[in-house]
Amino acid sequence: MANIVFIATSLDGYIADKQGKLDWLQSVPNPDNIDTGFVPLMERIDGLVMGRNTLDVVLSFGCDWPYSKPVFVFSNTMTEVPQGYEDKVFLVKGELKDVLADLNTKGFNELYIDGGVTIKNFLKEDLIDEMVITRFPILLGGGAPLFGDLEQPLNFKVMKSEVVLGTLVQTTYVRER
């Protein structure tokens, strides 16, 4: 069982700019659509866990639904799944550990944890096992940080670090417990 973060950050650790935009993710050309690890991640996982804000961002992209696995969305305000996504998106509520235990019981053991607030909440509860962080060579100077305050330090071990697309540094970390 593993809870996995797969995310891009700026050099200064932001996942969105000051306006909450992700345009900077297009700053590195990828004309041949070379995969940077997303395809193997999607093959590995059983499902995704994200918050409502991240779901809204994904829906705003105006493209085909990017996930082939079930998406579990934490939301205190959402009462129903957007029309057309009832077989793809499932609402969850409750304590993280309880929701995870329920998902694991249902066979969802390898989970992709996505979205700033959701990742921070999982880290606060020490529920992240692996992180793949891709750093873009740009300083945003502010915005939504990937990491927030923690009760205690969490140690991770570098498993792999490589340059992708000739300019992005992608590092895989595994939690040391």
Question: Where are the language model's segments positioned?
Answer:
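Enzymes that bind and transform nitrogen-containing heteroaromatic metabolites
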Residues: M1-R177
